[in-house]
Amino acid sequence: MAAARCLRWGLSRAEAWLLPPPTSCCHRALHRQVEGTEFRSAYSLDKLYPESRGADTAWRVPGDAKQGNDDIPVDRLTISYCRSSGPGGQNVNKVNSKAEVRFHLASADWIAEPVRQKMALTHKNKINRAGELILTSEYSRYQFRNLADCLQKIRDMIAEASQPATEPSKEDAALQKLRIENMNRERLRKKRINSAIKTSRRVGTD
């Protein structure tokens, strides 16, 4: 009995040394499956905007046609993050949650030329000396939400600039003319009042 027990114990020890543990086999198989791949977060740009890679999927319209409804090519943008301003405690002081998106407007061929020209005139205060249109967002505590807000601002700008200019009706033109006349009349009235006040001060000193 003792000899058989010793034999069984020796065989079990040999199997333990010769056979790899099942977890290592699983790890090796998993490593072979993911070898050559790259980990991407659920909030990576490729997963948040899967249809926005390259200029082929971007806004490109012939002539003066209306701008399309496709997404923005994220790989054509320069995206950075920095500290937010305003209240927020330690989260504001330690986390780079503010998103900044910029791109060169004149060379953005994924936007139609007439739309780019109109955007350059309408939003000239957002364009730096290098010709880059800069947008920022810090309304949220999270980077990906602020980035999404910046992209939505670009969409709104493109949609606004894509609207064709409409001629005002006769009623609107007459109303606009009346408003301008009233503004000029009020401006001249205030100017006369200020002139009378200055004249009265000079008379009082004499």
Swiss-Prot record:
Native organism taxonomy = Eukaryota, Metazoa, Chordata, Craniata, Vertebrata
One GO CC term, this protein: mitochondrion
**Originating gene:** MRPL58
What protein is this chain from?
Answer: Large ribosomal subunit protein mL62
Q: Which locations, inside or outside the cell, does it occupy?
A: Mitochondrion
Description of post-translational modifications: Methylation of glutamine in the GGQ triplet by HEMK1.
Q: How does it assemble?
A: Component of the mitochondrial ribosome large subunit (39S) which comprises a 16S rRNA and about 50 distinct proteins.
Enzyme nomenclature, EC number: 3.1.1.29
Q: Which keywords does this chain's UniProt record carry?
A: Hydrolase, Methylation, Mitochondrion, Protein biosynthesis, Ribonucleoprotein, Ribosomal protein, Transit peptide
What role does this protein play? Essential peptidyl-tRNA hydrolase component of the mitochondrial large ribosomal subunit. Acts as a codon-independent translation release factor that has lost all stop codon specificity and directs the termination of translation in mitochondrion, possibly in case of abortive elongation. May be involved in the hydrolysis of peptidyl-tRNAs that have been prematurely terminated and thus in the recycling of stalled mitochondrial ribosomes.
Family under the similarity heading: Belongs to the prokaryotic/mitochondrial release factor family. Mitochondrion-specific ribosomal protein mL62 subfamily.
| Catalysed transformations (reactions) | an N-acyl-L-alpha-aminoacyl-tRNA + H2O = an N-acyl-L-amino acid + a tRNA + H(+)
The cross-references to Pfam families, in alphabetical order and at most eight, read: RF-1
Residues found modified as N5-methylglutamine = Q90
Single GO MF descriptor: peptidyl-tRNA hydrolase activity
Annotated organism of origin: Bos taurus (Bovine)
Transit peptide feature, positions = 1-29
Q: Name one GO biological process term.
A: rescue of stalled ribosome
